[in-house]
Design a protein with these regions (language model features):
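Outer-membrane beta-barrel porins/channels
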Residues: 2-400
Length: 400
């Protein structure tokens, strides 16, 4: 799996603003008096002091940079917590990294009709994302204007292990028809996340900066945990027609809502509830064909469909899943499809393959959670993402 990509989005906000999500975080943390709120503003380090553990980092950063304000009555009780009106916003991200898999397998067959195999898989994850979100905003119909920029750096590393077992059976001795069954155990990942953030605001009265490197040990937040993926089940069928055309089809199911998140001691994390509510079962279907057009050349074609793993109403709820995270953006993926065609050559000494692959999917991108109106409709319209990837693959080898 290759994570390398860049993404950019820009558009009007019609009054929606990330600052209101920050304000909701402060409200949800139970700030009820001016003394409580001013204590957050005056604290030496609200990101590590135990009295502020219930305050999400992003909410605290917004309050301490003037993006979140409060009104209170003559008794000091807070009557309103609010942000700014967003004019327009601009987002950019750059991602790098990959998941590498190393397989160790054994296999055997019985009478060339019953084939059995087992594979031990070892995985290595290395992922880095830098993102920047900037917003122009106003108050009182433009009488006061300002802007802010939120930069996030997120890195995760990990290793995992799983076991795959499967069988292929030719039920009829003189027929090329075959079917297969395979089961993949959950992948047990040991993960380590490291992230930091900088929020800078430019307001009519003054400017503020909150750099988490100045408050966190080692300059970043570090979190070690376990992720256990769901079981995966696979069935396949295949045959040969006329001695020259190979056909195969494959179906796979994986219930993403069964993914487990645990701390290093094996205790379930808060984000587990969000996994169950926002992820769902994924269905994958593949078909392929290869035909020999001569003794040396063959042509190939294939199609792959994969359903979306995310429910249509999913959103990123930072206070519930992990209140130390400051990257509010999220992407709700739709189904994914891929089409490929290829040509193969098999000579006495040299063999070669060339293939073209077209991979495409859609998604809804949100720079932040804008919430719902009274009718239950999203206040922030998503950015419609159309992702297309074209690949030309070439392989050449020599027989010894």
């Amino acid at each position: 799996v290759n994570f390398n990509r860049q993404f950019a989005s820009k558009g009007g906000l019609n009054g929606n603003s990330l600052t209101w999500q920050m304000a909701d975080m402060i409200d949800g943390a139970g700030y009820q008096t001016d003394n409580h709120f001013n204590g957050l503003l005056d604290a030496n380090n609200p990101y590590t002091e135990s009295s502020f553990y219930d305050t999400p980092y992003l909410g605290a950063m917004g309050a301490r940079t003037g993006l979140v304000d409060v009104d209170w009555d003559d008794k000091g009780n807070i009557t309103k917590i609010y942000g700014w009106e967003g004019i327009d916003g601009e987002y950019y991200s750059r991602e790098t990294g990959s998941i590498n898999e190393y397989d160790f397998n054994v296999s055997f067959n019985v009478r060339d009709r019953f084939y059995f195999g087992a594979t031990l898989g070892v995985y290595d994850i290395d992922y880095l994302r830098y993102s920047s979100y900037g917003e122009n905003m106003q108050r009182l119909n433009g009488e006061y204007q300002g802007n802010f920029t939120l930069n996030n750096t997120y890195k995760t590393e990990g290793t995992g292990i799983d076991l795959k077992v499967g069988t292929i059976i030719r039920p009829f001795e003189y027929s090329p028809f075959r079917f297969g069954l395979a089961i993949h155990t959950p992948i047990l990942y040991n993960m380590s996340d490291r992230y930091t953030s900088v929020l800078a605001s430019n307001l009519p009265s003054d400017s503020h900066v909150q750099n988490l490197k100045d408050f966190l040990y080692g300059g970043q937040y570090t979190w070690d945990y376990r992720m256990i993926t769901p079981w995966r089940f696979n069935v396949s069928v295949g045959t040969i027609v006329g001695g020259i055309m190979a056909l195969d089809a494959e179906y796979e199911f994986e219930n993403y809502s069964a993914t487990k998140l645990q701390n290093a001691e094996g205790v379930e994390l808060n984000g587990q509830s969000a996994v169950k509510e926002t992820l769902k079962g994924v269905h994958s279907f593949r078909v392929g064909m290869e035909t020999k057009v001569s003794s040396a050349f063959s042509v190939r074609a294939g199609y792959h469909f994969r359903s979306t793993p995310i429910t249509s109403d999913a959103f990123k709820n930072i206070p519930v899943t992990d209140n130390t995270r400051t990257d509010a953006e999220y992407l709700n993926l739709k189904s994914r499809q891929a089409v490929s065609v290829g040509l193969g050559y098999r000579g006495r000494l040299v063999y070669a393959d060339v293939a073209y692959k077209y991979d495409f999917y859609k998604g809804d991108f949100y720079a932040f959670d804008g919430g719902l109106d009274q009718s239950g409709n999203l206040l922030l319209s998503p950015t419609k993402v159309n992702n297309e990837r074209h690949q030309l693959l070439f392989t050449i080898g020599v027989h010894f």
